[in-house]
Amino acid sequence: MGNLATNSRAFFVTGTDTEVGKTFFSVGFLRALNAKDLTTVAYKPVAAGCSQTSKGWQNDDALALQQACSINLAYDEINPIALAEPIAPHIAAKRATEAGLTIDMSIQRIEQGFSQLLQKQADVLVVEGAGGWRLPLGLDADGQQGFLSDFVANQNLAVILVVGMRLGCLNHAMLTADSIRQHGLKLAGWVANTLDPAMPCLHENIESLQGLLNAPLLGVLPQLASPNEVQDYIDLASLGL
């Protein structure tokens, strides 16, 4: 699996859009792994929408991941790039830079943090993206546009796609799956996350995606009260875990 330590497995969790349940699934996924006595660490390299704390800028999603890991990690290890404004990260970084802050949102910085987590020698490393699959990181030193998906491709990570079940999700899911494969990556599985139980033809849409995505359906998540319940609805065996 690319540059991974020999005793580690890493998965990149992406979504068909923002606010489709990536963090909810990722936290539940970590806790399901912990329940199987697997050691876990998590990485959310980029987070926008952070609050100022006594320990610096912190993001609620990254904090939830930190609490779900079986190995204790400092906040900065999980989320090295914490941006204040809840907007597209590359725009938030540009605005922060214009305000006099130093923001390094390069692929190299993201890969550095990833390498440090590999040194923890966890059984499984869960990386959660921000927004959707093709998240812009802004221009690099050579004026080239970088994307978070470039980091995933560089590390050859297996991808888990969280599909937010709502009108339009078929197109979003298929476009995302196509792009993942165009990067030469494996779509290890996908999760149907029920955003609206009253969605017309919910089950028919899930059945359609099963035929269209050509990847294992890891589980169908109803609306749940807690990520602790996720493990009751997902099949880890499909991931070889």
Language-model features: where?
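Glycine-rich phosphate-binding P-loop
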Residues: 12-26
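Switch II (G3) loop of P-loop NTPases
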Residues: 103-106, 110-144
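Short internal beta-strands
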Residues: 44, 160-163, 188-194
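C-terminal lobe/tail of nucleotide-utilizing enzymes
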Residues: 2-5, 177-241
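Charged helix-capping and loop-helix junction motifs
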Residues: 140-149, 174-177, 202-207
